[in-house]
Amino acid sequence: MSKFTEAELEYIQSQRLGRLATVNKNGDPQVAAVTFRYNPELDTIDIGGYDNGNTQKFRNVALNGKASFLIDDVLPPWKPRTLEIRGHAEALSEGGETVRSGFSPHLIRITPRRIIFADTTVDPPQHSKRNV
């Protein structure tokens, strides 16, 4: 059984771009726009890139194993949706090409520990926060 609700999974699978926040060895935050996919076999978010293994975000994850991932959009006239996933992150040397053809083999994998979801496109609006 997934840690994500049906509505959250539908939202994740409708999006292609997210924002990954990590912290370097000095405690400085870094955020990057990233391409991702939901991995149903592991119930994780997998993040890839063309040169993922040589990025600051990859080094940050390898260093401390922490990340926050955000997907958001706004539908007209002003209906925002957001999904934040906080969790354990792994810097892996294989699997990146499963996110998108042509990506490097290096992969960042996030296993959710906390999920925060808001969807104002439905009536009544949905808002939830939970540890998983």
Model-derived features: where do they sit?
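Short, basic/aromatic recognition patches
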Residues: 1-19
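Hydrophobic residues positioned within well-ordered beta-strands of beta-sheet architectures
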Residues: 32-34, 85, 108
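Short beta-strand segments
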Residues: 16-50, 69
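C-terminal edge-of-domain segments
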Residues: 80, 94-132
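Short beta-strand segments in beta-sandwich/barrel cores
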Residues: 18, 67, 89-90, 114-117
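Short, structured beta-strand-loop surface elements
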Residues: 51-106
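A structural signal for short, well-ordered beta-strand segments
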Residues: 36, 87-89, 112
